[in-house]
């Protein structure tokens, strides 16, 4: 079994409610975020198109952060969630350097931290804070096969602002706007 996130670009307004909910739930320091919402523009006037993307840990099938960690502080749970144990972390930053998505962050105390898919909330029957906070329901979370059944076959894991999914096999499924995939093709990132 593998868990993952679904993101619908057609529903996201870039409000950052997901980002704020994650920051609040994790009691993160100023300047540290585990979920990051951005709005991107493609083209030039008068043919400008925009799209927003909300990024966090993709709980990859082959997590580069876990492979790079020399202390074993990063582990993949049975459900597929990639968890970082800050008590075991020695703060060498190998996970930060290894993740192609830039997900793990070093805190002021020198130790790393990252999205844990709110696994304690999920174990209590809830949903991740970011998903619960989204006013437009642009985010969802669940077992990968269930997400694919629920949202269909048109989902992608590669868009212009992300590195190729070939290396880590991220468990993020995106209902992408044409602007995000067209920009990828124009940049020579034609994954489809």
Each model region followed by its residue ranges:
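Non-ligating segments of multi-cofactor redox enzymes
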Residues: 1-192
């Amino acid at each position: 079994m593998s868990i993952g996130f679904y993101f619908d670009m057609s529903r996201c307004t870039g409000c950052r409610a997901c980002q704020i909910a994650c920051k609040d739930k994790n009691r993160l320091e100023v300047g540290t975020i585990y979920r990051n919402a951005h709005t991107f523009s493609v083209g030039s006037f008068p043919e400008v198109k925009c799209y927003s993307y909300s990024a966090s840990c993709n709980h990859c099938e082959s997590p580069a952060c876990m492979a790079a960690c020399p202390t074993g502080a990063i582990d993949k749970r049975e459900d597929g969630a990639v968890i970082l144990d800050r008590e075991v972390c020695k703060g060498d930053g190998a996970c930060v350097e290894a993740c192609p998505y830039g997900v793990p962050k070093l805190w002021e105390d020198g130790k790393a931290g990252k999205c844990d898919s709110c696994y304690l909330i999920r174990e209590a029957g809830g949903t991740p804070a970011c998903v619960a906070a989204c006013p437009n329901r642009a985010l969802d979370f669940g077992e990968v096969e269930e997400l694919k059944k629920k949202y269909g076959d048109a989902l992608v894991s590669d868009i212009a602002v992300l590195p190729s999914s070939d290396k880590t096999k991220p468990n993020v499924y995106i209902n992408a706007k044409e602007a995000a995939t067209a920009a990828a093709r124009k940049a020579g990132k034609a994954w489809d």
